[in-house]
């Protein structure tokens, strides 16, 4: 009987079956969602554990190679694929019944070109600018953009309760400054104009002083990840640093207004800040409650910078 044959499989054979079933197809772009789901329970036998880790390591290297290949193709086809623009909104937030979060987003602050749900590449919500966690609200926001009446003055999102009591207290606090980061796919023609403008950037303050991409070599210990990340042991962290002088890599009209007001009222209006405009994905082999897993983070390493 087929069922009886399946029962005779040992741990190593079952692991091989899982690897065959979950291995991504060769060629084409790799699915980050599929990579995030890859997780395997750890066998008790030490030899099986070593073998399983070697297989996972091979998968990690294959996934990393394909991600780099995808990135190289994007870099060589900038007229076809442009980095998402990032817009920071400040929605109104309140706690509803059952502890659910209710977000109100005024249509007046939505970027030009919305409501086009397809332009939303990703939407990340934070209870405050310094919050360590963000919540992915891409799907509910896209749904609201598709279904809400065009004449409605605002969009309303209902989210699950905050995971911790401290987050619930932050919502009620007057110091809460929630942020919604919209990563937008630019229109093709506009994207080409922005790419040409970026190529002509010249820092008026001198070389290396304006908003730019900077790389820092860090170990897992430096990052505080040594207790939950297995590989890679060292990371080339790309981040955005530098000043934002007038008309230099301004992300939007708000950045222009902010700079003008900063010149008039430097004590009350801060200058625009240098922040990531897009990101490169990064793959980690990390520990889980059931063993180890592959996890792809697509908002960890800065790829490009602008002033907001």
Curated annotation (Swiss-Prot):
Transmembrane segments: none annotated. SUPFAM superfamilies: Cystine-knot cytokines. Its main location: secreted. Glycans are attached at residue 70. Residues 165-178 have a biased composition (Polar residues). Belongs to the TGF-beta family. Hormone produced in response to various stresses to confer information about those stresses to the brain, and trigger an aversive response, characterized by nausea and/or loss of appetite. The aversive response is both required to reduce continuing exposure to those stresses at the time of exposure and to promote avoidance behavior in the future. Acts by binding to its receptor, GFRAL, activating GFRAL-expressing neurons localized in the area postrema and nucleus tractus solitarius of the brainstem. PROSITE patterns: TGF_BETA_2 (PS51362). Residues 152-179 are annotated as: Disordered. This is Growth/differentiation factor 15.
